[in-house]
Amino acid sequence: MARKTYLTLFLLLSISFMLKAQTMDGGLTNSSLSQSQPFLYTMNGLNPAAQHWSLNYSGGYGQYTVTPLGFDGVDQNIGVKGYLGNRFTILTNIGIGFGRGNTQTYQQAEVFKDFIGGKNPTGFRFGTSLGVIREFSNDIVILSRFNAAYENLAWKFAANARLEKAFATGRDGYDMISSFGILRRINGQLFGGVEAVGQDLEGLWETDEAEGGAKVLIGPSLNFVPISSRLSFSLNAGPILYVTHSTISPYDSAVRELPLNNGFTVKFNVGFNFL
């Protein structure tokens, strides 16, 4: 009799625990944690709540800007981001830009791997990536980045340190691009914060920086994930500040023309989890 009582209590406790776990997992799956990329410039591998495949449509408008901060004119991009297993994530993008009387295209493929964390929907994770880009200027660029993120139901933090090697004349031997983003829950599934990107920051101490000098983009960000929806929305806008100007003329290079004036860019992303 006592054995049956203990067995019954054990079964009831087990069922209660499983139901509670399912409720928590379902809540996280349908939360802001399930989106593929809350930020516009700062990318990371997928957390367990977002380990699916998503289609991302992004676009923007910019003036006096360069890749990867934006595009001079109007650009539109279609991307796919998906989970490959064992904490590997793949990101692909194709884009088209209209500006300066020309039509230009852009392609990207990148694979991410989380080495620390990445086993729980919330908390800290850290990893790296390797990829290749064909820029709007037709330059071929190989990139690798260290990426870190921290997420919970109220906060989102992300940071990238991205190293690029462009195979084109008139470009730096290597470029370092740093970015970070912070989002705080405002109400429900609506988040607000800021995202910043620094490019060619070696121009702060090198007067002969090959690509015109240091550039910084910083601006407010919004992110929204409707409850029990496969959609997510992100928006960022801000000025592009040319903090320093190199003694090398930007127009010495026939490959691409670099702006001399401060600029601005507006960028959005609409994500859809299709698998």
Sequence positions of predicted segments:
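General helical structural elements
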Residues: L7-T8, G117
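Sec/Tat signal peptide C-region and signal peptidase I cleavage site
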Residues: F17-A21
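Bacterial N-terminal signal peptides
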Residues: T8-S16
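Transmembrane beta-barrel domains of Gram-negative outer membranes and organellar outer membranes
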Residues: Q22-S144, A149-A168, D175, L183, ...
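Anionic-ligand binding region
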Residues: S178
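Bacterial N-terminal signal peptides that target proteins for export
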Residues: M1-L7
